[in-house]
């Protein structure tokens, strides 16, 4: 298979006209040549933090605080999940997965509520889809054993030492929320030696020093943080210290659109477009241990083809900036997963 157009090549997303040569799902070559194609070829997205279980309750809880919305065990999300039957939860998640696939997401890192059964429900929701998520079980060691790792709610919610050690012994991924409500749980989260931290809205200089010294990646979800009224993470400062990826967080409060997350982060921070696009692709893949997120030889051919001649993208003078700040679902020509 060949994919032609203006290709955003490598980790710097250098625009080159040509074709991506794909064999058996792997990028074999990138050939520079005139193609006459108006397509823009970018890596498919990696959504580095999601909770798609609450797809059953989109826009529920308007005006509620963070704790009232999502804090375990009795936040609105958890009450709704307990009161909803399995079939409905699977069907709602399946529609979210379909939406992510259609909008160019190759993988998502899911903090999966519900223990072992929660992991099983997500796998049922993935039937006939090409999206390949990284599933982090929650609540129990058994859920971790049945998934790709463990996603902890936050150090203030319990003692995660035993689960952290079990996850390490299993050679799996351990992520934890930190600094979402305030700074109090950031040091305890770092003490667990996590593979990555999520949110870090209230990160302070001493935390940044520890994060940099220990090379702990960060996942930020700025749209979600605004909805829950906790502030916004210092994305620019984090990006100067560590690997930063973007996530869309709860479907209850935000659509799982990486286009929207990129645009918001770009306009919030005014970071270079290439930096933001890395946060939506390569950096999430790096955190999750995936072989995608960048167009180069030997990578998995997870590609998103945009129409560079759409009403929205035509006449763009900076292709990467246009992709980050204005591209959307309507501009997609094809998704190759």
Model-derived segments and spans:
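Active-site neighborhoods of metal-dependent hydrolases
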Residues: 181-183, 195-256, 263
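Divalent metal-coordination and catalytic microenvironments
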Residues: 5, 20, 25, 38, ...
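N-terminal metal-binding scaffold of metallo-dependent hydrolase/deaminase domains
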Residues: 1-34
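Histidine-centered catalytic micro-motifs
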Residues: 43-55, 172-181
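His/Asp/Glu-enriched, well-ordered alpha-helical/loop segment
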Residues: 191-192, 234-310
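Alpha-helical scaffold segments that flank or form the walls of functional sites
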Residues: 40-41, 58-128
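Metal-coordinating catalytic core of metallo-dependent amide/deamination hydrolases
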Residues: 111-195
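C-terminal cap of metal-dependent C-N hydrolases
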Residues: 300-337
